[in-house]
Amino acid sequence: MSKQFSHTTNDRRSSIIYSTSVGKAGLFTPADYIPQESEENLIEGEEQEGSEEEPSYTGNDDETEREGEYHSLLDANNSRTLQQEAWQQGYDSHDRKRLLDEERDLLIDNKLLSQHGNGGGDIESHGHGQAIGPDEEERPAEIANTWESAIESGQKISTTFKRETQVITMNALPLIFTFILQNSLSLASIFSVSHLGTKELGGVTLGSMTANITGLAAIQGLCTCLDTLCAQAYGAKNYHLVGVLVQRCAVITILAFLPMMYVWFVWSEKILALMIPERELCALAANYLRVTAFGVPGFILFECGKRFLQCQGIFHASTIVLFVCAPLNALMNYLLVWNDKIGIGYLGAPLSVVINYWLMTLGLLIYAMTTKHKERPLKCWNGIIPKEQAFKNWRKMINLAIPGVVMVEAEFLGFEVLTIFASHLGTDALGAQSIVATIASLAYQVPFSISVSTSTRVANFIGASLYDSCMITCRVSLLLSFVCSSMNMFVICRYKEQIASLFSTESAVVKMVVDTLPLLAFMQLFDAFNASTAGCLRGQGRQKNRWVHQPSRILLPRCAHGICVSIPVSSGCRRLMVGYN
């Protein structure tokens, strides 16, 4: 097995589950946590079906050779995820260059490679339109050969604190920007509605919580089966089967959601009234659900389409779509909630969510149809599948999706359950809890970006058997986490009044938020260390160590604490926030 670096932050980021939850983003796909049995071929029985109908296409011989022969994607001794194995067969040129640059820097640091090419010129980056000399063409091969030779001969390749600080920081910076954009999708709704009033803010919070628990979390869990199946089909060069699996999963998920859509329209207010004492909040939340239901099919198609592209090694498509849709979402929230001419008030927030879901789906479709990417994503699409093919082999897909549904639901409940308890403390406490949770989610994006960058670096060192360097990376990650958490603590404590005033003009809510933010600031230190250590575990392929404790570590203690603090109403939001953290 090659000892070269093979992981980038792009493929790590692609396995992150995102939603409009007021809790912290940054959950990973269950396929990344729950190992399948070694050498199990989950697409067995469908290969012939796909091969018979696979469309023919022409391409360069070197591209065919680059894709390589199919090998098992479930090798138990390989810590790489299923998405990464498929991506191995279609490196993006920018990612490949970055990995080579990281290897080159380490070789130069250890004096195993000179800083000049064979011709003595400095290494330079060349644009696509510039001619590349023979020395530059030979340089990647020289780096790869030197790296492999050094690893195989047992020569010591070590890193330094300075080098790891630089690499982790540079890899984390674009992730911070991306994750904040993702977070802005939920932030925009909370921010716009919070100025309408405390009850409207509580209605959006309850509606979003119910939508996440009863719909979006289950949908994302169901769609995680594609992380396994599509990666195997694409790795086997059974390209047509990728499109079949994606459409089949979309059909299953949409049909599974139809009964819940009926419940949202007809029974949501009555069901919420059984748990929430404020009847007006239940009515507002039910209206939120009725509008949001129209966007759920778009959300399903987006999740399936995202995995359709990711299994082909195209990880940046959803990010490009996000760069367009996130600003549009903020604009729509302003126009539909606050604008004097077209604004509709409270219902403008869920309507913005609906429009955004469909725009994200449309964005992925436009990208797939117009992209010049060398992987040609439409080679995996052979048109709409017939009805009999859509309703075939459901059991295998559902069995693979069940662990995903269970895990994602457990993670979401760990955060969303506090919303139910906060509603028993009163409307003001519910609004304050929503604002504080939103601030916590936003503050978490910096340490979480460091965590993803760390897991990538650790995975590369583990793959190259450079265990001492892996330890240095983990120490640097902890140090960077301490620095960023200290900055978060300072900002939250120093500007707590200004932050609270941004979200609400209600004096009671502002006071609760101001009183609670010091607790949140104190917990930033532990939050950052939790993210950092989780990244170290993920890079070592030990995600299960963290996953097996999730229900008992998060859900049960928070339920118990939430019950305790919601009994004495005078305790307010501060004690509830202790359970959140």
Swiss-Prot record:
**Residue ranges that the UniProt entry lists as topological domain Cytoplasmic:** 194-248, 303-345, 493-581
**Example of a GO biological process term:** S-adenosylmethionine biosynthetic process
Q: Where are the transmembrane segments?
A: 173-193, 249-269, 282-302, 346-366, 472-492
Q: What gene is behind this protein?
A: ERC1
* Predominant place of localization: membrane
- Acidic residues composition-biased segments: 37-66
UniProt keyword annotation of Transmembrane helix present: yes
Name this polypeptide is given:
Ethionine resistance-conferring protein 1
Q: Which PANTHER family match?
A: MULTIDRUG RESISTANCE PROTEIN
Q: Which family does it belong to?
A: Belongs to the multi antimicrobial extrusion (MATE) (TC 2.A.66.1) family.
The residues exposed to the Extracellular compartment are 1-172, 270-281, 367-471
Q: What does this protein do?
A: Probable transporter involved in ethionine resistance. Overproduction leads to accumulation of S-adenosylmethionine.
Which controlled-vocabulary keywords does the entry list?
Answer: Membrane, Transmembrane, Transmembrane helix, Transport
Q: Where in the cell is it found?
A: Membrane
